[in-house]
Amino acid sequence: NILSLYTSHDTAATFIDKNNKVKVLEYERFVKQRYAAFTQTMSYREGLGTTDEQRESFLQYIKDNVKGEIKIIIISDPDVNDYDIIKSYFPEAEFHIIGHHDAHASSGYYTSNLKEASILSFDGGGYDATDGECYTRTYVGKGDNITIVKSYNYSLGIPYGHLASCIKEIKPGPDCDKHSLVYSGKIMGLCGYGNIRPEWIAAMTYYYTTMQQVSIPLNQLGESIGLNLDFNSIEGQDAYDLAATSQYVFEQRAFAILNEMLAQGTSKDIILVGGCALNVLFNQKLSQRLKDIGGTLTVPPYPNDCGLALGQFLSYTQKKTKVSAYAGFDILDRDKFDDYKEKYKATKCSISNLVDHIKDGKIIGILQGESEIGPRALGNRSIICDPSIKDMKDILNSKVKFREW
């Protein structure tokens, strides 16, 4: 049997379980720590590292649920410092390495119904066995094979997310104020309040071409457009317009990459993977453009790093594989259900009762079956409420989701 482990932030494991199901287990759900990393090389980013006790519990859970004996373990980083602890649970296993973007591409293509596709993998970067650090790459999938088309030495994810560090209204996550993993989603949400500033586009485009890991290009951008872009330095309409202009440039650069690939006669059926594939504003525009030329857009439910363990697994097996969007953990404390019923004086609730509660402004949590994989709630671990009720968005964000907007 094969075990695939992605051990950086958004750690996950993929294997075949005793019921012959493909499992994709997200570590953050197991340790109750958002973006949790199995590897302790991430401990320098506050809130991401985990303890040996947590790591051992996760490996034991895998060992208890995997089918047969693990002979192959797939990882993405040859510098991973976790060989010893992994090897102690699976002493007979050989280690194999699959590159970051190869895994992303595989997670999208091998789980799709497409016999041929053009693939764009783009994010904040990751290790590749041949190119070292790699940020953006295009591929062609055909039959059971995936072939690299072109690698790009710039990231769209890093400049997009890093821009949020200067906006006061965006609360950074706990991991690191300058490289917070929450930034990209929040600045995308802020775009709706802003307008594209045509006079900023040239400077923003230059920022995108130079920004990788350092803050100097952000300071240069601020000088070019007349804003102080230090940490938590701007707010209001300038901040909103900065977000909207950044979104515009992000989209133009992503379209340019795809147009370059399509100009070579590759398939008009596009698969997007990598963290940038969570940018639904871009995805909507791309979907319409592809529809106009007879193409389609596919984005798997797990395009970000939580899907890398699955991608590594599929890159190794190179087989089209049906993977349920509900391939995650079963309810981890199912055995305590009777205790909870007694403790909270639970009563059975019919569908009509639930509807009445929702109409009365209650917020309902849904917990059933095995969890979704990926960052989008799809009904098994979900929150539902009535959005037509005045201030419901603000109530939900303040009491449950703790979001700014």
Please annotate each region the language model reported.
Residues 22-45, 225-245:
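Gly-rich Lys/Arg/Thr-decorated short loops/hinges at beta-loop-alpha junctions or inter-strand turns
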Residues 2-35, 68, 80-93, 97-206, ...:
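Flexible beta->alpha loop and helix N-cap segments adjacent to enzyme active/binding sites
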